[in-house]
Amino acid sequence: MASRSLNGDSDIVKPRKIALVTGITGQDGSYLTEFLLEKGYEVHGLIRRSSNFNTQRLNHIYVDPHNVNKALMKLHYGDLSDASSLRRWLDVIKPDEVYNLAAQSHVAVSFEIPDYTADVVATGALRLLEAVRSHNIDNGRAIKYYQAGSSEMFGSTPPPQSETTPFHPRSPYAASKCAAHWYTVNYREAYGLYACNGILFNHESPRRGENFVTRKITRALGRIKVGLQTKLFLGNIQASRDWGFAGDYVEAMWLMLQQEKPDDYVVATEESHTVKEFLDVSFGYVGLNWKDHVEIDKRYFRPTEVDNLKGDASKAKEMLGWKPKVGFEKLVKMMVDEDLELAKREKVLADAGYMDAQQQP
């Protein structure tokens, strides 16, 4: 849209880019939304209907939609299991970029609900890709598509793992992510879709779900420190992972869609640490010995374990100019600080009689 300036020159007002984000209420979705808003985007997110509000990770950036000039993040009901809703929202929103972050993303849970995991993670990605393809054809558009992959796809393949490393998935979740990865490659090759796979290694933050091991540790640690909890039960503490900061990784997602040609990229810190090392750093940071509080529970071991994941992100560094900013110890301490403050607030409630002092989070 053009406007005339006082000196007679025509000033071109560049329209805002529009992004559609599935999984917007999750850890990655919230950080990506913040990042895109800072870049001047209008961001739309698909959320599933829930009996309880599940948008707490977005509350700090939420603006009442009645304030149309400032509400640049908008939420809509949709689901990767419902193809009609995906196509409908593409037609209504007309996004420039689609980021598919939605998933049943817990590895252990995927063994309990494998059908659902495959339907949402694998077939859900296929539904969204097909919706993008048909929307592009019918409307003469060229949406760019990002598919969230996972280092779990590599499974038992020895590290370091790069874009050329063979996949060997060891869970229904990982197998479903492999399917989504290849659907994305197929739509890129068959239909010329600008579609990228981001193979992200483990990335954490204070917004990480509490049933993931890193947040489970820091959440329990905060409560132990203030006297609300005494024990933490864990599974395989020798498992080694390449842990980075989620806030760093969303930048890599965006960069993939800003290139001349679509491609697939590994995103990782290129450092690997065991769960035991995470315990050492986190408990040591607050002056505690984890051995006094942690017990190993065989129930938390998976039917097939993934022992060591360590990424080779040289391609992302060279082609995207991306590199992680937050190191392992800084990440751990960031998470401990946040969860210690949360535990202190819980302690106030417990002391006032509003919650059971030993109530687990």
From Swiss-Prot:
Top-level taxon of origin: Eukaryota
Pathway in which this enzyme or protein is active: Nucleotide-sugar biosynthesis; GDP-L-fucose biosynthesis via de novo pathway; GDP-L-fucose from GDP-alpha-D-mannose: step 1/2
Any one GO CC term of the record: plastid
Gene Ontology process terms (BP): 'de novo' GDP-L-fucose biosynthetic process
Function description: Catalyzes the conversion of GDP-D-mannose to GDP-4-dehydro-6-deoxy-D-mannose.
Assembly notes: Homotetramer.
Protein's UniProt name: GDP-mannose 4,6 dehydratase 1
Provenance organism: Arabidopsis thaliana
Lineage: Eukaryota, Viridiplantae, Streptophyta, Embryophyta, Tracheophyta
GN (gene name): GMD1
